[in-house]
Every structure is written in structure tokens, then in C-alpha cells.
Design a protein with these regions (language model features):
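Short glycine-rich, Thr/Ser-proximal phosphate-binding strand/loop in the N-terminal lobe
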Residues: 17, 21-62
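Acidic, Ala/Val/Gly-enriched low-complexity intrinsically disordered segments
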Residues: 9-12
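Short beta-strand-loop/turn "lid" adjacent to the catalytic site in phosphate-handling enzymes
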Residues: 75-123, 149-164
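N-terminal phosphate-binding loop and adjacent alpha-helix
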Residues: 44-83, 115-120
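ATP-dependent carbohydrate kinase catalytic cores
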Residues: 136-176
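Active-site phosphate/pyrophosphate- and oxyanion-stabilizing loops and adjacent acidic/basic residues
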Residues: 132
């Protein structure tokens, strides 16, 4: 199953002629957040989370509301109105294998991340979830790119030499 990959920048509403993007990269002990205006980095923040706080959550998905509030508090402290952000981009994890590149996050991508279809319970999947929830809340677009489950094998590369047995790719392209 492939997700929608192509989109036009014209589809993404801009505020004051600026294309503002909030990038969300959840990790095991922190959430990295960057704000861009066009191609210029406005700021990058690493929001650390105490282990004692994270251990209170029985499942990675349960951290989503907590991390959402931490991000909103940081944006408020930086004087950034989330409504002025044109697009939310989240690190991808937990979804179907897919080609590298930019992918529009929709309800299907969100649901797949929640389910952890790739077998992952890493906080990376919260990136898609947070981007989608922010996009819904503020009426914007959500994207992800270069999933932790990239598959760009051609049909020939899938052959194993054993009838009915095929290779599949599960490559974290950002770790190459």
C-alpha cells in the first residue's frame, strides 16, 4: 500500500506571504522541533523529557497529548501562533513501507502509525501523529518524509530464487 506522495505547494496556505513549516522529530528522551520560514531556519529546540515522566505512559501512543502540550508551550514561549504555520511535518514511523520522499499525512497514514504497522513502538511514530493532530486542529496540511520504513526495491531485487518467497525492504534511509 502506497500513500499519496505528490502535492503542490499551492495547496498549502501561506500566512503573510511566508511559508512557515513546523518540523517535529520525537525521540526516546526528547522532542526536537524546528520552525522554518521558506528555507530559513527560524529556530531549533530540543525539548527534553524526564524519564520519570515518560515512564508513566504504558504505551508510546499515550505520550502524544503530553508531547503536544510541550510543543504548544514552547511555541507560546517563542511567540509563535500555530495558526501562522502553513504545514506541520513529522518524523515518520509505524507505517507501511513506502518510497522515500515527501508524503501527505491523512487519516490513513495517521491510523497506520497509531497501529504501528511496521512493528515499531518507537516514539518516531509520534511525529506523524502530532503533525496530523496539529494540522486538524489548525486547519493546515501535514506531511512526513523519508519514513523509517523505506522500500524502493525493484521487482528483480525482490526475487530470492525460491518460488513464492520474496524480499521486502525495511530500511531506515536516514541512517544510511
Amino acid at each position: 500500500m502506497w500513500y499519496t506522495i505528490r502535492f503542490s505547494v499551492k495547496e498549502v496556505e501561506m500566512k503573510d506571504g511566508r511559508f512557515r513549516i513546523l518540523v517535529i522529530n520525537p525521540g526516546s528522551t526528547s522532542t526536537k522541533v524546528s520552525l522554518f520560514e521558506d528555507e530559513t531556519s527560524v529556530f531549533e529546540r530540543k525539548l527534553f523529557h524526564e524519564a520519570s515522566v515518560l515512564l508513566k505512559f504504558s504505551h508510546v501512543n499515550d505520550q502524544m497529548p503530553f508531547r503536544r502540550e510541550v510543543i504548544l508551550d514552547m511555541l507560546k514561549a517563542e511567540g509563535v501562533d500555530p495558526d501562522t504555520i502553513a504545514a506541520f511535518v513529522g518524523r515518520c514511523g509505524g507505517t507501511h513501507s513506502q518510497p522515500s520522499g515527501v508524503i501527505r499525512v491523512d487519516q490513513n497514514v495517521y491510523d497506520d502509525a497509531v497501529k504501528g504497522l511496521d512493528g515499531s513502538e518507537h516514539p518516531a511514530k509520534l511525529g506523524v501523529m502530532l503533525a496530523w493532530k496539529f494540522a486538524e486542529e489548525f486547519g493546515k496540511s501535514a506531511f512526513t518524509l523519508n519514513s523509517t520504513t523505506v522500500d524502493e526495491l525493484n521487482d528483480y531485487a525482490r526475487l530470492t530464487g525460491i518460488k513464492g518467497v520474496y524480499r521486502f525492504a525495511h530500511t531506515h534511509c536516514l541512517n544510511q
